[in-house]
Amino acid sequence: MQQIVILGGGAAGMAAALAAAQAAPAGAVRVTVLDRNPRCGKKLLATGNGRCNLSNTGIAPACYFTADPKALAPLLNAVNTAAPLEWFRALGLYTRTDEAGRVYPYSNQAADVLALLEGHMARLGVEVRTGCTVNTLSQNRNGYAVLFDSAERSNETLHADAVICAMGGNAGPQFGTDGFGTRFAAQCGGKLEPLYPCLTALQTARPNKALAGIRVKARAALLDLDRHTLLAEETGEVQFTDYGLSGICIMQLSGLLAPRRGPKRPAVELDLFPSLDEAALTALFAARVPLLPGRTPADFWTGLLNPKLGRALWAAARLPDTPLDTLPDAAWQVLANTAKHWLFEDLTPCGWKQAQTTGGGLSLTELEPSFQFRGCPGLYFVGETLDCAGMCGGFNLHWAFGSGITAGRDAVRTLRRPHKKR
């Protein structure tokens, strides 16, 4: 009996295993999953705050961060052709879509998605071995040999006619990921793009700890200070932290901070009043003074902004702490300009523990549209190991499930082709 071995039991690995088992002739192919955790899908359970944001109705190449957008196009087309949502519905999963296009299981439970995957894998005879650490992969004339340590013994060897590497990236080490997937890809001769934490909060050089926990609707723009250019902007909720800035729109911008191709001097500019232009905001500020019961800067923000945030903005504008009616008219233009262009410099992405996904990884140029490693029939790489990080909103799980399904199906189709060493 021929065998397909999947290295990693996360979203991509389970999708690959189940898709292969579905495509294989009955009794002809053994599908085996090796995972280092006590149970598959540990990280999946945490996605979408436990609700499992499966996909998005707005899937497009522009929603992914990669060093090679041209190489992404055929791979993303293959992922979309795999139709992960239709595949899940055929497994019995009913979904719902919110106003932002994010797709969730109707139950809002990531545990239900995992239970369906586990149940169908068991039904089709997929062997799942947990507590396994892969050491090496070698190629021979008959296929591949996987050397690994299991919970029972060290240096076990498993023969494989095809291998699908789904060992994840560096993000979320608390879920059992440690970057071995990308190191493994390099050991196989693959070109790696530099790794970086993606979809993460940003540290600033001089965080205002008094603002920690405050949330505000704002427009956040990522600037390249050296080139004086606007790189991207997002509108949404910004959260101030004791180390800097967070919130979904900040996390989206973090994807552009890739080594080598990202800005050398990035900065985030916040617009706290995105619905007003600067002239209208100046007029609003000036008109408030006679309306307020008090005449101090502390009174100024009542009913307008969180008072702590207002005090920080006042300080950023370098206005004196004097009665409001003593300030010149020009002060309101200065304050409005600061509120529309509040600059945060010296940015550093937070580490792997806070990152939702991994930027960089195995170059997409190394892959066929089937996710097969070029020059190595029967060897595939899928999911977060690859240089393709999606934005927040279900794009990463869509990529993980779709790449796994594509590779699993193709592995069955190519089993009888002769293996040639790269």
Where are these regions (language model features)?
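Beta1/beta-strand and adjacent pyrophosphate-binding region of the FAD-binding site
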Residues: 1-12, 32
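Short hydrophobic core segments
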Residues: 5-7, 34, 134, 157-174, ...
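Glycine-rich FAD pyrophosphate-binding loop
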Residues: 21-49
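An anion/pyrophosphate-binding glycine-rich loop and adjacent beta-alpha core
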Residues: 38-40, 46, 54-61, 191-194, ...
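Glycine-rich active-site loop/strand segments that organize a redox cofactor
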Residues: 49-97
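A glycine-rich dinucleotide-binding beta-alpha-beta segment and adjacent secondary-structure elements
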Residues: 130, 310-389
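A conserved short coil-to-beta-strand element within the FAD-binding core of flavoproteins
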Residues: 130-143
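Glycine-rich loop(s) and the adjacent beta-strand/alpha-helix scaffold that form part
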Residues: 162-208
